[in-house]
Amino acid sequence: MRKKAISRILALVVPVLLSLNSQAFATSVQDESPVTGSAVEAVHTVPSTVAAPVAGHAEAAAGQAAKAEEKPGDLIMHHILDNSTFSFEPFGEVHLPHLEVAGFDISITKHVVMIWLAAILLVVIASAAGASVKKMSANQAPKGVANVFESLVDFISNDVAKPNIGHGYEKFLPYLLTVFFFILVCNLLGLIPYGATATGNINVTLTLSVFTFVITQFSAFKAQGVKGYLQHLTAGTHWALWIIMVPIEILGQFTKPFALTIRLFANMTAGHIIILSLFFISFILKSYIVAVAVSIPFAIFIYLLELFVAFLQAYVFTMLSALFIGLATAHSDSHDGHELEATARHGDGLTV
């Protein structure tokens, strides 16, 4: 009889206790976030030697939840924008040092690292190609990297610098070759996994354009003199129109480097956005069929197109730089000057 009475009491009490416990748990879940509530309970109910690891796991879980909730757009911008962190998912991250001198932030960023890497690669490749050419006999053709390097040098020299600058193009050739190979290597490094595109940073493209602008203006003063330079601003018009023509010509001098800056920056940035967007289509739609049939093939196609664009943009920037230098150093008589002017305007209309 006693056993039956005890079993009846337990049968009545246990469901009540379970219901009260479930209600209390539901109330705590509504009042607190899951991670914070569990972390607080762990700290208050377990010894201090166990509380710290539990709290650490709670923070790690919160960080993983935040990453999981990160939107594809945020991930794309994180890949494109410059920062001090190299992300090597799933292996971890490398944080670059923060440097500040006299209140100026001169921290090393991933684009700075890629610029250094591009410079080192250019020095190594050019040195190896030069050493290979020196070892060959006069009748022997270059091979491998030396052959590719020599072909590109001949192309910039004979098909870019010489026709656009004309007489005296040799003194501008070192700058044009440096700009071409630097932009090309930076563009290609941006296509490597875990890499970054330095030419997708408007500060980098602006600096390159400023170099071209300074060389162009200095060459114009040297070739034409102050008088000839000022006469070029008036463009042979009547003095009554100078108030209109001079501001337009001065503005035109600054629109050229601006066009160089935006063209290179926009093209290199747009290509990476398209590639990443195509990859994220499969994640957004949560479909393996879309990934296999649409997302991955189109991303590979755009990636191959970016290889072509890497060469094309290096060529366009170098060609327009040579064109602006040739326009600045052209003799004012002439048919050559007008022809270069027309070609420059046509070049400013390029959208590739």
Curated annotation (Swiss-Prot):
Which one Pfam family would you cite for this protein?
Answer: ATP-synt_A
Q: Which residues form the signal peptide?
A: 1-26
Q: Keywords assigned by UniProt?
A: ATP synthesis, Cell inner membrane, Cell membrane, CF(0), Hydrogen ion transport, Ion transport, Membrane, Signal, Transmembrane, Transmembrane helix, Transport
Compartments in which it is found: Cell inner membrane
* Any one GO CC term of the record: proton-transporting ATP synthase complex
Question: According to its record, how does it sit in the membrane?
Answer: Multi-pass membrane protein
Its annotated function is as follows: Key component of the proton channel; it plays a direct role in the translocation of protons across the membrane.
Please report which protein family the annotation says this sequence is part of: Belongs to the ATPase A chain family.
Q: Which NCBIfam families match?
A: ATP_synt_6_or_A, PRK13419.1
Q: Assembly and partners?
A: F-type ATPases have 2 components, CF(1) - the catalytic core - and CF(0) - the membrane proton channel. CF(1) has five subunits: alpha(3), beta(3), gamma(1), delta(1), epsilon(1). CF(0) has four main subunits: a, b, b' and c.
The protein's name in its UniProt record: ATP synthase subunit a 2
